[in-house]
Amino acid sequence: MENFNAPFRFDYVGSFLRPEHLKQARADFEAGQITKAELESIENEAITDLIKKQKAAGYPVITDGEFRRSYWHLDFMWGLEGIEHIELDHGYFFHGEETTHGSVRVTGKISGEQHPFVEHFKFVKQFEDEHTIARQTIPAPAQLLAELFREDNGTQTLAVYPDLEELIQDIAQAYRTVIRDLYDAGCRNIQFDDCTWGMFCDKNYWEARQKDFVSLEEEAAKYLRLNNLALENAPEDLVLTTHVCRGNYHSTWASSGGYEPIAPFLFANENVSAYYLEFDDERSGGFEPLRFVSDDKKVVLGLVTSKSLILEEKEVIKKRIAKAAKYIPLNRLYLSPQCGFASCEIGNKLTEEEQWAKLALVKEIAQEVWG
């Protein structure tokens, strides 16, 4: 495995469409109709089949497709000590659709011991071979901080943590614990998924936030510092990357806007080796902000949408790669879908066959561009 370094010329973000029988099994478990052991057996079988398909598609990365999760972010948060699962009276309001209502609440000191995702990773790790590496995706620490202050959640958060600095330090330490445990389990590739930066790009979001007397610079500095604290003392051979997301629920989106507002903060100063960036439509803006990416970092261009079954034209994607290469050398660019195919259990509006066709297209284009 020492010859593998993410990102790869053709890559993907992590989540895959759940098979219908897996969705049914999870519903049956919630209804008390099957046991936890029976659900885990069905999950294991579905993940094993997914990894076979990932390998057959020729991709060097294997994941569990986030098949054991309901949400891309909340399940990880619920696995931390001091955090509990709550249901709000409404979900996130995406473009034309409302999400389900799950959220988090602080109940005590936050820590990361014995996180269930470590065992989840071990199951994937066993399928690694000389051609593949197992990746673990987790929500960024900044995402947890944002969720803890989402609407009324902040009241409980401040009741438990009146000192914001103590909260930041505990979140960072919890993440360092999980990262070390994943590393000890054999993980060498961890991807932060982070919607906080996507929201910073959105003008409407920031106009709404002005009532809190919060500046973008202050919030960006706080989130960046937290993410970097969580990455302190990470092993040198652990590849750490960030996927910046604008929301991906049932083929809808949450935020719009180019990367210009966040680029000077994030692209130059986050202590990761690569960014997976959404560039699948006009909502993402142009490639000009890539000029802020520091010379030691790589960029995975999310030019192929995971929200639609329509296959992009190869030549259009190649021309867009060439445009991006005006700001970052081609040898530091890579290609992927813009996001996962099922950031939440409901999944996007395409079939499994259409999902694999998207990944085949990404691979074909990458091989034609980079050889």
Predicted regions and their residues:
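Domain-level signal for soluble alpha/beta catalytic cores
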Residues: 1-371
